[in-house]
């Protein structure tokens, strides 16, 4: 273990609600943006506590995606700041959740998110009845976005009863932003990559199905040694998805293989960057944020070496980006969003 990361809160929750589900992206002009869900207190239950009450069951609440920008107060000042929260354009639906963001080969920001016009959530969405919307917004920046609903095309092409793009930042491959969708057909789920560029679907990957009945859930994509790697959370609330993850690799269109990785993981969205992976390193709770370096899954059983750690406290959904000579990590803690910054030289080669 080489690096230790200090952290600070950057987005506080409103009243009894939550600020959660971070997604980081750097625009071609260097602007670093953080998108997140602003959520009211849930009608019942404990929100994002370790009980499964996440987007799957509470999306009909009036969630909305907001954004902040990382800035520096003065020239030569190395102390970063985050702006006050800002709204997305009114062209997007009033209810939005789970931002997945990336930049295409033409420099356009793409933001995929889930929405609903009624009371339907992920679990009761049906292809032939009321179902989740699959919103795609794109443009030069968050102030200027065109919007379309991909639901009709995606539900038709995948046969889904419900689908949503995994939150967080994603990769660009052959000029297209690759959006990792979780697709539910009946009570079975798989992962399918949707490639978009200029607001248009370029292709859909083959379905990625877990081994021996394992159901795959939210997925982080990475480019690693010329391969597209999918690092998948296993489906299951209240710890039933803990103890392992699934890593698959391919060319962006089809999958060449996969490995089930036994690891200390509670079942949580996480972020992979090449062979580095940041996640809550615990079987029983979303805590102990740790950066590990993985062995290539195509070489056999996956092994991990810890290279950096936080303080052992709460660590929920997270995202990571490289910003100049720094690595910026944003994660959920105490119903808000926190930031940790570590010199790039201490973490990445």
Residues of each region from the PLM?
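Asp-box/BNR beta-propeller blade signature and adjacent active/binding-site loops
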Residues: 1-349
